[in-house]
Amino acid sequence: MIVSATTVKKVLREEPLGPAGKRKGPSWREFLRAHAKSVIAVDFFTVDTVWLQRLYVLFFIEFESRRVRLAGCTAHPDERWVTQQARQVAWTLAAHEEPVRFLIRDRDWKFTPSFDAVFRADGIRVIRTPIRAPQANAVAERFVRTIRQECLDWLLIMNAGHLERTLQMFFDHYNRVSYCPTRLCA
């Protein structure tokens, strides 16, 4: 089907659509500010040990408070492991006073359909960020930068147990100290 430019122009005049930048509806930033209490983000980052073993760390971060939860770390994040971590986090989120409604994640292959199903079963809508758009999950990406700069770049990690102890100490510190640079946390 071929549509001429004149037809497109005519339809756009008849319909109340403005230019792309001026259409109605909230921007991504406005959406996040309005729903900050009910949004969490999830992401992975990797850490290489001194024995050249790559470990994958799964974490969740709340948008409003910037509170971070360590889900776990493993050398092999297969479907079974990732789904089990999702179950454990979903169980703790059920005790939240403010219900979580949205989970933002990237399109990493490690996030399997069963991972998403755990959250959908609890009524949490899973929002996948656009391809190659790390800014869409900026809160999680910024946390990865923070933990690398303030902790992991200064240490030689021996194994998974050493990494988990280190991360738990950093997460406890991070959750006690106010790192939130925005007014969302106020």
Name each model-derived stretch.
Residues 1-186:
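Charged DNA-binding/catalytic regions of mobile-element recombinases
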